[in-house]
Amino acid sequence: MIDSANRADVFLRKPAPVAPELQHEVEQFYYWEAKLLNDRRFEEWFALLAEDIHYFMPIRTTRIMRDSRLEYSGSREYAHFDDDATMMKGRLRKITSDVSWSENPASRTRHLVSNVMIVGAEAEGEYEISSAFIVYRNRLERQLDIFAGERRDTLRRNTSEAGFEIVNRTILIDQSTILANNLSFFF
C-alpha cells in the first residue's frame, strides 16, 4: 500500500522515451546528490530538497502472494521515515552535531544510484523518477550495513545550480527486517 494509488501506478508502467538531454541531467543530479551525501556535505544536500519535501520510507513486511499489495505500509500507517521539511531540518541538526551518539564517530557511506527512469511528469517541470540504489555504510570498526531498494522521487526543475529539487522521495527498501543499529543517515 504505497502512497496513493495514482502515484504508485505511474511507477509500474513502462516509461515513454524521453529526451537524452533530460535523462542525462537527471542522472547527473542524482550522482551529485550521492557525492554530497558520501562527502557528508549535508547542508548542501539539504539545499536540494524542496520546502514542501515529503521524505517517506514505509515499513516492509513479508506477505503471502494474495496480500502482496499490503507489503509496504501506507502513508497513514507506521513508517521508518515520514518527514516534512521541519523534521528533515531536525535530522540535519542532529546528524551534524557533536552530541548525536548514533553518528559520533560518523558513518562512512557510499551511495550508488542506477536504473534511473523518468516514468512520468506530474506538471510542467515536475518529473516522476524511479531509481535503484545501494547504500553501503561502515561505522566504528566492525559495523557494516548494506541497504538496497528503489527510490521513487518527484523532481521539480528550478533555477539552482543543481537544476532540480526533490519534492517527494519514497524509499522502498528491499529488506523487511532491518538489522542495522540505526537509520541515522539519508538515502
From Swiss-Prot:
Keywords: Aromatic hydrocarbons catabolism, Dioxygenase, NAD, Oxidoreductase. It holds the Pfam family Ring_hydroxyl_B. It comes from the Bacteria. Gene3D superfamilies: 3.10.450.50. Pathway: Aromatic compound metabolism; benzene degradation; catechol from benzene: step 1/2; Xenobiotic degradation; toluene degradation; Xenobiotic degradation; xylene degradation. CDD domains: ring_hydroxylating_dioxygenases_beta. It is an enzyme of class 1 (oxidoreductase). Belongs to the bacterial ring-hydroxylating dioxygenase beta subunit family. Catalyzes both the oxidation of benzene and toluene. The beta subunit may be responsible for the substrate specificity of the enzyme. This is Benzene 1,2-dioxygenase subunit beta.
